[in-house]
């Protein structure tokens, strides 16, 4: 058997090594971007007198108490009735991000609504007919211009700005063919007209 080699342990090398640097402090979490507040008083009304009269007529149709006011929760409905397609988030933003309690309790007059309508109308990010059709084309597995009604119901109730089951049913009433399919181009025309 071969003799063992005398292996010397480096004693001084371990002591001379500098201590590891402390771990850097974790970076602070990125601050949430602040929602820009919309200054409704700074919005210039660009609608004609005829348009304003039409908007006021629609606004007053939503007045349930006869005081020429609507609740904040009705603003989105009036905006959509007048042909705009704002998201719920856009409506809340133009309202100043009110609490749910304020949505149902606070009321506004037409003069307060008009700058909101102008702000939404000025928004260039509004989805177009083509945007909606392209979004539904993703679900057209056969490439024949139709989507399954059941799948569309599921999408409307569970993705994005979720709709209530009653809203989905009202929206889709009379849209399905005998096979349970929906022509999505006709469907988009239908929803953009209501």
From Swiss-Prot:
User: What Gene Ontology molecular function terms does this protein carry?
Assistant: calcium ion binding; structural constituent of muscle
Enumerate the InterPro entries for this protein.
CALM/Myosin/TropC-like, EF-hand-dom_pair, EF_hand_dom
> Start and end of every EF-hand domain?
50-85, 127-162, 162-194
Region annotation (Disordered) maps to 1-35
User: Record's GO cellular component, any one?
Assistant: myosin II complex
Alphabetically sorted, this entry's keywords are: Acetylation, Disease variant, Methylation, Motor protein, Muscle protein, Myosin, Phosphoprotein, Repeat
Feature: compositional bias, Pro residues: 19-31
**Record flagged with keyword Endoplasmic reticulum:** no
Function per UniProt: Non-regulatory myosin light chain required for proper formation and/or maintenance of myofibers, and thus appropriate muscle function.
Tell me which PANTHER family the record gives.
MYOSIN LIGHT CHAIN 1, 3, MYOSIN LIGHT CHAIN 1_3, SKELETAL MUSCLE ISOFORM
Name of the protein in question: Myosin light chain 1/3, skeletal muscle isoform
Q: State the organism of origin.
A: Homo sapiens (Human)
Q: Which gene is this protein's source?
A: MYL1
């Amino acid at each position: 058997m071969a003799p063992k080699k005398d292996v010397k342990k480096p004693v001084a090398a371990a002591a001379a090594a500098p201590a590891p640097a402390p771990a850097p402090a974790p970076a602070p979490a990125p601050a949430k971007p602040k929602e820009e507040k919309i200054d409704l008083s700074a919005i210039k009304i660009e609608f004609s007198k005829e348009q304003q009269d039409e908007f006021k007529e629609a606004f007053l149709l939503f007045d349930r108490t006869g005081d020429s006011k609507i609740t904040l929760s009705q603003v989105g409905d009036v905006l959509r009735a007048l042909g705009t397609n704002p998201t719920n988030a856009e409506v809340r933003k133009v309202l100043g991000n009110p609490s749910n309690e304020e949505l149902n309790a606070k009321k506004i007059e037409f003069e307060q609504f008009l700058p909101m309508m102008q702000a939404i109308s000025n928004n260039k990010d509004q989805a177009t007919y083509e945007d909606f059709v392209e979004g539904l084309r993703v679900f057209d597995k056969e490439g024949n211009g139709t989507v399954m009604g059941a799948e569309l119901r599921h999408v409307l109730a569970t993705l994005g700005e979720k709709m209530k089951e009653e809203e989905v049913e009202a929206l889709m009433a009379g849209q399905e063919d005998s096979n349970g399919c929906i022509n999505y181009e006709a469907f988009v025309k239908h929803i953009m007209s209501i």
